[in-house]
């Protein structure tokens, strides 16, 4: 007489037959240990990781960041107070270049007192230009002050060292009192003014528009030299409207839908999957090659890279300027934007045709123009500037946070 066996009982029998040496058991244990123990322990303080413990660390890290920014602001202030002014001996990088190859235009407003954001930005550019030497002789610093008030102390201080364009100099402007003009439209018009002033004053080959809370990374000039001299000679890059030098780290995950990122993510699995499979087969003394094991390690590596944070793996590209990637741009944000001169003139025309408002800032306006005008734009990865401004010039923020 035969007896029927339930599916649950059959499953239990099969599980009992599995030994610790079973491939399935080993890979299951590896998954649990990696994603349940090792990665959370190693990454719980990484700000842009899915393992980041926000409730434990965010407030403290935000306060530490603000305190460090205050110290760096004070250091930048002392730096300029001790630097010889235009009445004395001015370093060559501050002197006007007849027709520069690259104009670095820093747009500034009077921000939260004490942090001296614009001083931090300009002092870092000055230091990097000095280190760059003859290679950067065709670079020109240019400050564009769009603060309506005359009380912008940092801009006044910098005017001793850097050529300055003041949008509201010598005028009693009631621009902000016009009910039809909101802060987002004013920011766009300020941007247009600074871009146009850069072109009219210097007629350069390129204009780098930098907001006053975007500190350049150490590698910015070697990377720009490589990109503009070599990579942007390629036909599909040559006529780009702009090149973004910054994209928020929180938006750099693979799960933020960008076609090129998906291809990169699959490429990570295709690269690391076979490598980890070979390592596993070698150390586990498994004969031959297993497609299921390779599929597991491909998915394992893709999941690990995404959960730890794509941002941190992008940092490996800083080893060489040639490793930086250039991919199609998305809409956010504008801390640092590079315009070839012909594209800058097209941008001025385009921006004069749009009106910005809440929910449609200048970054979205620029991005919307790509499809409307048949233009292309790109972003370089990893970022070439650090965004240090936790206090927005558009929105009141009494409790600034890193996220």
From Swiss-Prot:
**Keywords recorded for this protein, A-Z:** Disulfide bond, Golgi apparatus, Membrane, Transferase, Transmembrane, Transmembrane helix
What S-S linkages are listed for this chain? Answer: 132-136, 144-194, 332-333
User: Which segments sit on the Cytoplasmic face?
Assistant: 1-22, 281-287
Modifications the protein undergoes after translation, according to the UniProt entry: Glycosylated.
Q: What class of enzyme is it?
A: transferase
Using the record for this protein, list the coiled-coil segments as residue ranges, or answer none: none
In alphabetical order, the GO MF annotations are: glycosyltransferase activity
Motif residue range(s): DXD motif: 211-213
Topology check: give the Lumenal ranges.
Answer: 44-259, 309-403
The record's Gene Ontology cellular component field reads:
Golgi membrane
> Any idea of its EC number?
2.4.1.-
> According to Swiss-Prot or TrEMBL, what is its membrane topology?
Multi-pass membrane protein
Q: Which GO terms describe its biological process?
A: GPI anchor biosynthetic process
Its annotated compartments are:
Golgi apparatus membrane
**Where do the TM regions start and end?**
23-43, 260-280, 288-308
- Family, per the entry? Belongs to the PGAP4 family.
What is recorded about the protein's domains? Contains three transmembrane domains, including a tandem transmembrane domain insertion into its glycosyltransferase-A fold. Transmembrane domain 1 functions as a signal for Golgi targeting.
Q: Which PANTHER family does the record match to this protein? A: POST-GPI ATTACHMENT TO PROTEINS FACTOR 4, TRANSMEMBRANE PROTEIN 246
Chain's role: Golgi-resident glycosylphosphatidylinositol (GPI)-N-acetylgalactosamine transferase that catalyzes the N-acetyl-beta-D-galactosamine transfer from an UDP-N-acetyl-alpha-D-galactosamine to the 4-OH-position of first mannose of the glycosylphosphatidylinositol (GPI) of a GPI-anchored protein (GPI-AP). This modification occurs after the fatty acid remodeling step of the GPI-anchor maturation.
Q: What is this protein called?
A: GPI-N-acetylgalactosamine transferase PGAP4
What is the native source organism of this protein? Answer: Pongo abelii (Sumatran orangutan)
